[in-house]
């Protein structure tokens, strides 16, 4: 399909990588977005309506092909659905530092979710924090929480492969049946009720 040229204040982006959310996008793909959540789950630049067909996604890293001189040729992150090229307002893209590989840059949307989760949970210095689920969002949340002085962060996840990740991030790991029951704060990030 032909893609229109960018107008004033817009950029044309060639996608390099796109992240797929196992939880959210599984609901979208299967047409199971609850009617009560459809407006909240709309993503920027979404095309179509729930339950579908719908063009969805919100984790694109690409290179600016055309646009303002300060962005031309730069790698950028955009909350855009999965497609190989797109035109968006220049204000919708964020430059990606050269030191950040594409595979990490696509996690920016997940990192935003983890940060918002911590803001809402309001952990305090010295809190014992349990992150239920050590997938992408849970791991990012745990990594951030572990930087708060005096905290003890424990990933509660049935997958024993998460133990090595927990250690690398300065956290503990336990399967549900061995989790500490003394948490001051519990954040559910498993994607499963």
Regions found by a protein language model. Give the residues of each.
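Glycine-rich beta-strand-centered segment in the early N-terminal region that forms part
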Residues: 4-20, 28-80
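Conserved SAM-binding loop and adjacent beta-strand
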Residues: 56, 88, 106-109
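A structural motif shared across PLP-dependent enzymes of the aminotransferase-like
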Residues: 77-90
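Glycine/charged-rich beta-loop-alpha catalytic/anionic-binding loops adjacent to active sites
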Residues: 91-102
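Mid-domain Rossmann-like dinucleotide-binding core that forms the NAD(H)/NADP(H) cofactor-binding site
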Residues: 101-176
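A short acidic, Gly/Pro-enriched loop at the edge of an enzyme's catalytic core
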Residues: 178-186
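Short glycine-/small-residue-rich Rossmann-like dinucleotide-binding loops
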Residues: 190-191
């Amino acid at each position: 399909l032909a893609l229109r040229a960018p107008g004033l204040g817009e950029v044309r982006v060639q996608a390099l990588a796109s992240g797929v959310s196992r939880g959210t996008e599984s609901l979208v793909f299967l047409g199971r977005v609850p009617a009560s959540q459809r407006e909240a789950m709309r993503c920027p630049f979404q095309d179509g309506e729930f339950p579908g067909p719908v063009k969805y996604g919100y984790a694109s890293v690409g290179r600016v092909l055309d646009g303002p001189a300060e962005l031309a040729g730069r790698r950028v992150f955009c909350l855009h659905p999965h497609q190989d090229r797109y035109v968006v307002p220049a204000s919708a893209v964020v430059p990606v530092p050269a030191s950040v590989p594409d595979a990490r840059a696509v996690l920016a949307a997940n990192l935003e979710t983890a940060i918002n989760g911590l803001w809402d949970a309001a952990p305090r210095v010295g809190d014992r924090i349990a992150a239920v689920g050590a997938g992408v969002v849970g791991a990012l949340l745990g990594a951030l929480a572990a930087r708060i002085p005096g905290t003890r962060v424990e990933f509660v996840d049935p997958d024993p492969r998460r133990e090595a990740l927990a250690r690398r991030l300065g956290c503990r790991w336990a399967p549900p049946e061995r989790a500490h029951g003394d948490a001051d704060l519990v954040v559910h990030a498993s994607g499963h009720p």
